[in-house]
């Protein structure tokens, strides 16, 4: 597959590591970033520890065009994501007047004042700008450094999604590569994945801009169900669709030759 | 929290990065590893590329006592996890007679023979031993190197879970630390997370063996719902329970003082 600007997602939170929470945020972001034309290269989940966050953000800097962190922006003692980002950037945290105004407004509308724990949410890495939180109290933050756009979003899914759509998407669209991405696929029944393997390989060679992947979901033998997904990138939507269909055609031929059938189609 | 042997989970698969599949395997494994007494330090999702897999397995070696990879063991062209593990170990892949016998048996029971793509599933890193797959065709692999136990499990959840329980758990129990881990919590209504923050901090100071975390799930203001979870480790189950309850007691007191109430309890 051609080189596309890379994106890293860094998910912060012990609850993810101990399996209390399933990381749906990473999948949601991965899908949006892919359709915007970025190549998601890593999702890294780290504990709520400054050094661990700094280590992974530091690895991503200069390597990924976009680095998105989720979680750890709230008012409690272990919300330390922006400390970790600041450490990776070699900068300090600074009270941002615009962010403080966002926090102040959020609480004053509800008849509450500022407390130490609430003011903490307006401490951003030096040089970062706040991202408005349309749903909750904690602003996000975005900063450009060493060729990477580093954006920090909340961990609560409704807040993360709203901030991504309203505040971050416009910034990403400016740096997203031109062109189009499509993803589609078929579900194949009656053929073991291992028998389909040579056809999938052939399909993947249709173009370097096409990525073909099989997902076995039934049993390998007995009642095999294999979903074959194709992701194609091209300069126009029509071209991307055409390449995806060309690749799927190779798989269809295999299904036919092997006596299987197609139970579902998901058009490009 | 006290130092416990660390575990890393390395999830292999483009479908996870592009958000087509939600990484439920990592949560499932994270929960089991935590209850076995390991501290899950990273979950890293990587593409189906040998170099990327090798990079992350290489980082984990010597740092994590246990490294578990999921996915990429199947018969298709992009199932390259064991190549990545071998590269990280500085070893080659080798046809393992025991693994080949597992694959041969799986297919012959179903009246099928071996093909090149099927034999590929028995190519393990030099020195690794196969892990039986009670559900599917591809064996797993386990190898001890540089102080780390590296285990590779399939990506299909039913296969991953069965292999973990039957083949890997006994090996992990041998190296797991003695002692017990409990996790429990309460759901608090009527108090914003930012007001509860000082009490949560106080609870987290009850013992270095206790970890307290709040998860806001309602809105910060209006109808706040905050789940507070406590994870406690100790040498016996009774001690772990006692420490968890002591920490929760601090939070309960805060809820009372702030005029909130507890809507759910999940006993230790």
Swiss-Prot record, chains A, B:
CDD domains per UniProt: cinA
InterPro entries named among the record's database cross-references: CinA (IPR050101), CinA_Arc (IPR023055), MoaB/Mog-like_dom_sf (IPR036425), MoaB/Mog_dom (IPR001453)
Homology family: Belongs to the CinA family.
Name of this chain's protein: Protein APE_1980.1
